[in-house]
């Protein structure tokens, strides 16, 4: 289905140890995490909170297992803080990822975000940016995009539940306001379906701008409870709203077909944060790997 040597398969460490709720998977070590990723048949991962930030140390651990770094999340605060604060941290982040050989930087605006707040209802309290904030976001992303390109990297914007860029309308607005040469898109199946969007619409409309893909599934019965009981994003994660591709309700066949028939080259990263005490990360990594092999031939 996919042309040879166009796709690398990664898996996010958040299934082993959760960055937002460190108590989930606190017992899982960095070495266990990357060893199980390799054993499950993946080529690499994004960066988690237990990963060493010394590139020499990290490279050695990964090379022993034939793994690479695909990217790492970066929180921007362009709508709520002076741009200089974001830029200072971004440059360090960019240089680290450049040193690890990554080609994209995952960015997500966290101004007004509720994704990390345990008791704030996800659907009821979703932030909405003012026009002035949209302008700050677009201008700031252009600046970060230029900084990334100084080292040969691209920024990929991660639409995300509980943030100001979550819905189809918001994604379209961001794409309309930003230069395709400077701001690319991360396509995340799980966040789109969780939000009630149509992922294939976004995929088809912005295919040339998509430079990174997160493969994530959802358990619809949990999402329904999140809405009914007005739960937060973190409560949704703890209750199992997300799972690996093939274990939920999302149909991936057309997603893979569209991407295979496109010029997409880069990473597919399985990202399915759930409680590792309830969903063994290695077991679910194997499930995901088998599903991708069967459905995408990768």
Curated annotation (Swiss-Prot):
Which example biological process does GO assign this protein?
A: inositol catabolic process
Which cofactor does this sequence's record say it needs?
Answer: glutathione; Co(2+); Mn(2+)
Q: Looking at the keywords, is Manganese present? A: yes
An MF annotation (GO) of this entry = myo-inosose-2 dehydratase activity
Q: EC number(s)?
A: 4.2.1.44
- The signal peptide annotation in the UniProt record is none
Q: Provide the top EC class.
A: lyase
* PANTHER family, alphabetized: HYDROXYPYRUVATE ISOMERASE, INOSOSE DEHYDRATASE
Q: Which HAMAP family is this protein grouped with?
A: IolE
Q: Report the protein name in the record.
A: Inosose dehydratase
Organism, by scientific name, is Bacillus anthracis
Tell me the organism's taxonomic lineage: Bacteria, Bacillati, Bacillota, Bacilli, Bacillales
By which gene is this protein encoded? iolE
């Amino acid at each position: 289905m996919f042309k040879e040597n166009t796709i690398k398969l990664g898996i996010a460490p958040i299934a082993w140890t959760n960055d937002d709720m460190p108590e989930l998977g606190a017992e899982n070590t960095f070495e266990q995490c990357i060893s199980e990723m390799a054993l499950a048949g993946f080529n690499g991962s994004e960066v988690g909170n237990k990963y060493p930030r010394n590139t020499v140390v990290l490279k050695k651990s990964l090379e022993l297992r034939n793994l690479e770094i695909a990217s790492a999340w970066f929180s921007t605060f362009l709508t709520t803080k002076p741009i200089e604060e974001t830029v200072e941290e971004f440059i360090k982040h960019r240089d680290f990822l450049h040193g690890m050989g990554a080609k994209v930087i995952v960015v997500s605006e966290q101004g007004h975000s509720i994704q990390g707040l345990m008791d704030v209802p996800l659907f009821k309290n979703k932030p909405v940016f003012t026009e002035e904030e949209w302008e700050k976001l677009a201008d700031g992303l252009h600046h970060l995009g230029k900084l990334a390109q100084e080292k040969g990297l691209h920024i990929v914007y991660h639409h995300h539940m509980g943030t100001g860029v979550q819905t189809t309308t918001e994604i379209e607005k961001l794409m309309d306001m930003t230069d395709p040469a400077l701001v690319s898109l991360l396509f995340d199946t799980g966040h789109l379906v969780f939000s009630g969007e149509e992922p294939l619409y976004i995929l088809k409309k912005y295919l040339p701008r998509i430079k990174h893909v997160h493969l994530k599934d959802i358990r619809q019965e949990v999402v329904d409870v999140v809405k009914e009981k007005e739960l937060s994003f973190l409560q949704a994660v703890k209750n199992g709203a997300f799972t690996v591709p093939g274990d939920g309700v999302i149909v991936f066949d057309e997603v893979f077909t569209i991407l295979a028939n496109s010029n997409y080259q880069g990473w597919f990263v399985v990202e399915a944060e759930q409680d590792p005490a309830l969903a063994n990360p290695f077991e679910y990594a194997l499930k995901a790997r088998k599903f991708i092999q069967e459905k995408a031939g990768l």
